[in-house]
Amino acid sequence: MHTGQKQWVIFISMGLMLFGFVSLTHPTITDPCDQPLLPQGVTEFLAKKFPGWKILRLSDLHPENQRAWLDSEHRDKCPGVAVGNFETKEHFSYAVALIPLDRDKPSFQLVVVNKVKESYQHRLLVEPKYPANYYVIYKVPPGKYSDPERIENVQLSLDGIQMEQFHVGAILFYWKNGRYHRLIVDD
């Protein structure tokens, strides 16, 4: 191998090592909301019923809350979508955290969408409000849940929807007797 070729090989090797080091120290964060999360009919229903609103994405969260989400057991899920058997064991319901498309008007609302025969219906669980930081939502499994003081508890036979504001608290929404109820829970 000639001196020029050796220098070229060393140069390329150093570049590859440096590139590898940079990519290890700055991992690419993929947003779990990039993949299709809802059936097309639900997506179309939301676009028609809630123009000017979008589903909360990981990138919409404050950087500290992005880290908290990525460190949680829900890291592979979109913080603005929860899919589960919230109202019946026979079919899925779709909970979505909606925020305005206009970032200058921070707001938040929580909606659950169900397919009823050939159309969709929605229930508004949280009317538009103006939080300092957005809430995230996720599905919780059936089981026993209590408020922080252990005064009130509930046994869920269906999935629940947990709405959490990092470092503040969480509210559990659950279906009982034909409507949603809420319980403040430990986050």
Give the positions of each predicted feature:
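Primarily extracytoplasmic ectodomains and periplasmic/lumenal surface modules that are beta-strand-rich
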Residues: 90-92, 101-105, 119
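Short consensus segments that form the blades of beta-propeller domains
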Residues: 71-73, 99-104, 162-163
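Acidic, small-residue rich beta-repeat scaffolds with periodic aromatic anchors
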Residues: 13-22, 26-55, 119-187
